[in-house]
Structure formats: C-alpha cells, structure tokens
C-alpha cells in the first residue's frame, strides 16, 4: 500500500448516480409531475433545486411558490418513478466490474428510502453484490 494514502477499511457507495444511473430519470419524473400540478419547472431546474434533497425541501418549495402539493402527488410520483426505472434504469457503466474486483468490505449508504434502494439494485442486477449491507437515512436518527 502507498504510505501516502490512508488505510481504507470500508468503501461506502451512494446508490443514485454512483451505482445506478437514476438521477436524470428521477428528476425528469419530478419535473413532469410538478408541471402536471401547475408548477412550471424544467428538468434542469429540478436537478439544481432538488437533487440530493429531501421530500420536505420539495414540499417547502411548492408552498413557497404558492402551489401546495395535492395529497396524491407523492404516491403518484413514486409510481411514475418505479415505472420509469422498470423501463430505463441501468447500472453505472463499469460498476459491476468494480464490485467484482473490490477486495475491501463495502456497503451502500443512501438518502433514498430503503425500498427504492433495494428496487434499484434488483432492477440493475447489483443486489447480490450487496446483500443486506444497505443503509439509508431512515435508519439514522436526525
């Protein structure tokens, strides 16, 4: 090992944008849902405003622009995202090879909910690489 580098005990992967190419798909779904709810916004604006942010940030933004979200918004968005992922989600190019060659312990830590992380990894064939080594914001006290 290179003495100039710190010793590594564990590799922690984020899911969205690191293991699976989901960010653009999710943001496109969100932008389309917001437009349907009467909020004019582009996918690029959604990427800038909400990527990596919580649902609370989305709700606050919509209230701030005078368009509170209907009760059906989030469940419908979740369905749209799942359908889009089923049709188009892919692993990040080369990540399966990286995981196959990695000789260190590794896991996933994500701000996405556990169901979405599992779904994404299963769709892309990456789930067996991680087993139960999945950690999400839901598991951490704020």
Regions found by a protein language model. Give the residues of each.
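Short helix-capping segments at alpha-helix termini
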Residues: 36-40, 65-72, 125-129
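Hydrophobic alpha-helical segments typical of transmembrane helices
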Residues: 29, 46, 57-58, 116
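Metal-dependent phosphoesterase signature
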Residues: 60-96
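Helix-loop "lid/cap" segments that line or gate small-molecule binding pockets
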Residues: 33-34, 53-68, 120
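Short, acidic loop-to-helix structural element flanking the phosphoryl-transfer center
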Residues: 7, 83-108, 114-118
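Substrate-recognition "cap/lid" segment bordering the active-site pocket of phosphatases
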Residues: 107, 113-142
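Short beta->alpha linker loops
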Residues: 25, 50-53, 76-77, 90-94, ...
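Active-site neighborhood of HAD-like aspartate-dependent phosphohydrolases
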Residues: 2-48
């Amino acid at each position: 090992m290179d003495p100039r580098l710190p010793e590594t005990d564990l590799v922690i992967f984020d899911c969205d944008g690191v293991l699976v190419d989901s960010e653009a798909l999710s943001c496109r779904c969100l932008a389309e849902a917001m437009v349907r709810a009467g909020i004019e916004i582009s996918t690029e604006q959604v990427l800038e405003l909400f990527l990596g942010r919580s649902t609370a940030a989305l709700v606050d933004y919509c209230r701030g622009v005078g368009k509170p979200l209907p009760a059906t918004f989030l469940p419908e968005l979740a369905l749209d995202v799942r359908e889009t992922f089923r049709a188009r989600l892919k692993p990040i190019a080369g990540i399966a090879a990286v995981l196959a060659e990695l000789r260190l312990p590794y896991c996933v830590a994500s701000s996405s909910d556990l169901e979405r992380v599992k779904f994404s990894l299963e769709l892309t064939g990456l789930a067996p690489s991680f087993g139960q080594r999945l950690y999400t914001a839901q598991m951490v006290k704020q």
